[in-house]
């Protein structure tokens, strides 16, 4: 069921989203996130070279790596050593919650369960596709199903 939900959201994203999902001051994500705080500056897409995720989420993490390659033409290696995208399993208040932070150095995703990680991946993929392969805005997103 997790895979179908992810595919549905991706399909909806590709159908509805305009050419660019964010402008200088506006970021549009589907579904709309619960909380987003913009920060000054950006992260170059070129810095996204590696990813690390918990071993128990390996299959889903590897699917995301494939999606990045196929949909965004972005090659990312799976590594435990200093990843530019770091996914952490943490205790969250509710199921499916996640936090996604884009810093100058990379991306941090915190999720309490695999579904939260999938939701974070969906949000990150929208941001990457909307960036037109250049820069991601620095921000912190907190989200959960509503």
Region roles according to the model:
Residues 12-13, 20-145:
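Acidic, contiguous N-terminal accessory segments
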